[in-house]
A protein has these predicted regions:
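An N-terminally biased module of ancient metal coordination in phosphate/nucleic-acid-related enzymes
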Residues: 1-64
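Histidine-centered divalent metal-coordination motifs
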Residues: 18-22, 136, 164-165
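Distinct, well-ordered alpha-helical segments
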Residues: 59-67, 89-96, 115-122, 142-156, ...
Length: 291
């Protein structure tokens, strides 16, 4: 995978598996130039651009904006495609984008059940085209019915899925209150997410955003064992919308990418395992597709 053109020649590769064009902050939309600078600041050498469609366009850029950025910065970005599964043209939109260079489907963040007929159409396309699918799980809001997601994994063993967001990471604990988007305190062993990662070779975990950061910081003792168990299934990603790598433009005042990389480095002293999570696992999912 080609590095950012202005990264240090000897820089260790870091793949950010979750970024967006025109990402809305608390004050403005981030420009392409700000995104590129943000990634360089965090040492990222390649990024996966996840498109939005439908309601998501109020927060981030569409398929066309991702394609344009990939074209304008060769070697620095690859892109996934998005479409609203409720629209009759969804599969055609996705298929067309894949034929024009998209190498995955996502971010899929829509108010449908994860096992709905609309989503099955998308999974079948992913199976047909051999591309991964990234899903945002949020209780009673997006890709609902997480407890039934196991049946999807069974039905599409050749499709690589990537789980993301609050209900995905909250379910590392067996005692999750599903209404609690960012649970704190000790994790109770036996959570559904932990088991799915253990039992199914076709599911991976996207460590991005506040939900991913919370998952690896709320209970450091659990997190150490969790990362050790799933070191070949976890993918570093940021989903960070700050303007400058220092928290600019955000209500929280910090950069998720910077903070999550630091937390991961603290939890993973083994350099080989760290490299696996920040580059190799994600690169393996993109293998054969990334330019």
């Amino acid at each position: 995978m080609a590095p950012f053109t202005n990264a240090a020649p000897d820089a260790e590769p870091i793949l950010d598996f979750h970024q967006h064009t025109r990402y809305a902050t608390s004050s403005q939309r981030r420009s392409d130039q700000q995104l590129v600078a943000h990634q360089i600041y965090n040492g990222v050498t390649k990024s996966v651009l996840l498109a939005g469609e439908g309601w998501m366009l109020s927060q981030l850029g569409d398929n066309a904006s991702c394609a344009a950025l990939e074209r304008d910065y060769p070697g620095q970005f690859v892109r996934f495609a998005c479409a609203d599964p409720a629209e009759s043209r969804a599969v055609d939109v996705l298929r067309g984008n894949v034929s024009r260079g998209a190498i995955g489907l996502g971010e899929l963040k829509f108010p449908v059940a994860v096992d709905s007929p609309e989503m099955h159409r998308i999974y079948k396309l992913a199976e047909e085209r051999g591309v991964p699918v990234l899903l945002h799980f949020q209780y009673e809001t997006y890709n609902t019915g997480f407890e039934r997601f196991e049946d999807v994994l069974k039905a599409y063993p050749k499709v690589n899925f990537v789980g993301h967001a609050q209900s995905w990471w909250g379910n590392i604990s067996a005692d999750l209150n599903p209404l609690d988007m960012y649970p704190k305190g000790p994790v109770r062993r036996g959570g559904l997410t932990d088991r799915l990662l253990q039992d199914y070779p076709n599911i991976y975990g996207d460590l991005s955003a506040g939900s991913g950061l919370n998952a690896i910081t709320r209970d450091p003792e659990f997190a150490g064992g969790f990362i050790e168990r799933h070191s070949r299934k976890l993918i570093w990603a940021s989903d960070c919308n700050c303007l400058d790598g220092k928290g600019g433009g955000t209500s929280d005042g910090y950069c998720i990418a910077t903070r999550s990389l630091a937390a991961l480095r603290k939890l993973v002293p083994n350099e080989d395992v760290f490299r696996r999570i920040v580059h190799e696992n994600g690169a393996r999912l993109l293998d054969g597709h990334a330019k």
